[in-house]
């Protein structure tokens, strides 16, 4: 990559607080774009709209999903927007390109019984389980992103208000409450997990060496929990975020409150979590529809 692209990635990291996982995706998109430029003997600075259309066709020819193509085009559009702020002679060749429609999907989430099984797995009386339980409790109790989790400092925890202050996207702070189970797990962890007691930094979640845990480390921990849990086959940090939102909405929380807790700027982003299970749909229907209520009472 050239120095402009490297500066762009650094800006996303420092000023927009992008996670390492998201930055890796942006970097991969730029590398693939550079390979196309080299293959077609094109220059970054003279890349035109017709070239952008050809690149779109090139991506589809590689049998990529529409969501992947959409993200890659969005990356390049954002990159050229950044470059335009540095050089007034630059034109964004992707600005008029028709954005491929994203495929609609329902976010995956865990049922309450599955969450109970996961928590039962980390009930073991071991030092590692103390740490693993805190990770699971915080992700499920607060719905925070994994990038927010790994950056929590000890002083961000408020035991008086029972909540945590996290730094979200765009370096925006928000306070997210947690319950008694989460509070207890944090207290036990701080009191009995030896690596956290001997470290020389303020990060809350650490690995077994006492070093601040990485996003990759969190994913490893979650995968390890799943391997030891019967009846649960797949897990990732965002699935716990989906679960947090889904369970709140299923229990009657309003969309605006969930939006605030998740740190979403747009309500439409939170709206994708309004899917509910068939069982919940029937429960609401029976309790709300006049004739259904009468039928339910007989």
From Swiss-Prot:
It comes from the Bacteria. GO terms for molecular function: DNA binding; tyrosine-based site-specific recombinase activity. Keywords: Cell cycle, Cell division, Chromosome partition, Cytoplasm, DNA integration, DNA recombination, DNA-binding. The keyword Cytoplasm applies. GO terms for biological process: cell division; chromosome segregation; DNA transposition. InterPro entries: CB, DNA_brk_join_enz, Integrase-like_cat_sf, Integrase_catalytic, Integrase_recombinase_N, Integrase_SAM-like_N, Recomb_XerC, Tyrosine_recombinase_XerC/XerD. One of its GO terms (cellular component) is cytoplasm. The active site is at residues 145, 169, 238, 241, 264, 273. Residues 105-286 form the Tyr recombinase domain. Residues 1-84 form the Core-binding (CB) domain. The keyword DNA-binding applies. It is found in: Cytoplasm. Site-specific tyrosine recombinase, which acts by catalyzing the cutting and rejoining of the recombining DNA molecules. The XerC-XerD complex is essential to convert dimers of the bacterial chromosome into monomers to permit their segregation at cell division. It also contributes to the segregational stability of plasmids. Forms a cyclic heterotetrameric complex composed of two molecules of XerC and two molecules of XerD. Belongs to the 'phage' integrase family. XerC subfamily. This is Tyrosine recombinase XerC. It comes from Staphylococcus aureus (strain MSSA476).
């Amino acid at each position: 990559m050239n120095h402009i692209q490297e500066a762009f990635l650094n800006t996303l990291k420092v000023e927009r607080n992008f996670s390492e996982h998201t930055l890796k995706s942006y970097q991969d998109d730029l590398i693939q774009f550079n390979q196309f430029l080299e293959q077609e003997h094109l220059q970054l600075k003279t890349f035109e709209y017709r070239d952008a259309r050809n690149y779109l066709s090139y991506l589809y020819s590689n049998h990529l999903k529409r969501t992947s193509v959409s993200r890659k085009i969005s990356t390049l559009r954002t990159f050229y927007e950044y470059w335009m702020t540095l050089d007034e002679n630059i034109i964004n060749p992707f600005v008029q390109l028709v954005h491929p429609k994203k495929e609609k999907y329902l976010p995956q989430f865990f049922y309450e019984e599955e969450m109970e099984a996961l928590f039962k797995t980390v009930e073991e009386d071991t030092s590692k389980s103390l740490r693993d339980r805190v990770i699971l409790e915080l992700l499920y109790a607060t719905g925070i992103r994994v990038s927010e989790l790994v950056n929590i400092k000890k002083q961000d925890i408020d035991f008086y208000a029972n909540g945590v202050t996290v730094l979200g996207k765009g370096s925006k702070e928000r306070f997210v409450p947690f319950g008694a189970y989460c509070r207890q797990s944090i207290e036990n962890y701080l009191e009995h997990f030896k690596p956290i007691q001997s470290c020389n930094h303020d990060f809350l979640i650490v690995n077994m060496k006492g070093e601040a845990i990485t996003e990759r480390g969190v994913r490893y921990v979650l995968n390890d929990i799943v391997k030891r849990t019967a009846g649960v086959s797949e897990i990732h940090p965002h699935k716990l975020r989906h679960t947090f939102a889904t369970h709140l909405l299923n229990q009657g929380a309003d969309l605006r409150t969930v939006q605030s807790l998740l740190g979403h700027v747009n309500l439409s982003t939170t709206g994708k979590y309004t899917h509910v299970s068939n069982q919940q749909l029937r429960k609401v229907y029976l309790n709300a529809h006049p004739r259904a209520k009468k039928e339910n009472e007989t």
